[in-house]
Amino acid sequence: YDPETEKFVLIDTCFFTHHLQFADDENDTLWLSGSTEAVGWLNTRLYDETGDERNAQGWCPTVVDTNGDGVITKPWNEPDMSGDFVLTAGDVAIDPALDTRIGSLDKFQRAYGVIPHPDGSVWISRRYPVPGQLIRLELGDNPPETCKSEVYEPPYDPAGDPKAWGYGPRGIDVDRNGLVWTALGGSGHLASFDRSKCNVLNGPTATGQHCEQGWTLHQTPGPRFKGAEGTSANADYHYYNWVDQFNALGLGENVPIATGTTSDALLALLPDTEEWIVLRVPYPLGFYSRGLDGRIDDPGAGWKGRGIWSSFNTGSTQHLEGGKGTASELVRFQIRPDPLAN
């Protein structure tokens, strides 16, 4: 959509589109998730200059270097398109002499969140199969031929302690230092992942559960499920998350925030102290949050010139507070430096 001309232009793509995120690069690259068969992007600068939608877009398959030779080569191990075969926790039936492609036609096992990384890579989240995955994608010099992926699963040992499990990554974002954050909608954590702590990045053992030391799981506040006291399961549901890189809210830079989707709240984690700040929308207003972003409209106006915005939406708003006729809304949050600040 062009605000100046008030015209919409439809751009055909050869890949699925779902979540979208602009990269901070010279091409204003727009990355789109929706599949693991092909993770795609649009060079918006080139498209604006030429109107050539075919040459302005590109895509990569997600293929992991499981033979450890440092490059991706064909033929590779192809996934069972039901999604049950590839790179799940436990035994992985792959030919170790080949690389391995990740993929599924099951909509719940496709790529979900997407975020460009400061090092030039792109990360996507995959919710299923349990425990879910984060996938790091490098384009190389000549994509799609040079695309290479890495896969990382939250800590999940079916034979181990359920309190240590993490599962269900949905949202994904990154701070200015390159630390990746994801909301684990299944286990109820806001989790960070630091790839620099990994000893193994590729090879036959790099199938997901090979870098537990890179993960830090922060259990979100809130009630537990009855009968689930011995597990990590939280009764809250975290649809997505976001990192406040530029102090738009007022809690500082690089503060990760998860949606408390079923607790009428946003959950901000202060990374230095691991303190939770809960931003609650009071009952009976209702607040089924599914995403958020920040705006600094006037850097010189103090707290009044900045804030974050979150969507209040679901497919069945009639079941929320307000009943039939309840509409989706946008909610703005601002934090005063002290209660009397004007």
Task: Describe every region a protein language model picked out.
Residues 1, 40-49, 134-142, 191-196, ...:
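Hydrophobic/aromatic beta-strand positions that recur at structurally equivalent sites within the blades
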Residues 1-15, 45-107, 143-165, 197-242, ...:
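Surface-exposed loop and turn segments in beta-propeller and other repeat-based domains
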Residues 19-27, 88, 92-96, 100-119, ...:
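Structural signature of eukaryotic scaffold interfaces centered on beta-propeller domains
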Residues 25, 34-37, 44, 127-129, ...:
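Short loop/turn segments immediately following the C-termini of beta-strands
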Residues 28-33, 121-125, 179-183, 254-258, ...:
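Conserved beta-propeller blade signature
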Residues 40, 189-192, 284-342:
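Blade-level signature of beta-propeller repeat domains, shared across WD40, Kelch, NHL, RCC1
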Residues 107, 128-130, 261-262, 320-326:
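Short, solvent-exposed loop/turn segments at conserved positions within beta-propeller repeat blades
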Residues 132-134, 147, 188, 264, ...:
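Repetitive beta-architecture junctions, highlighting loop-to-beta-strand starts
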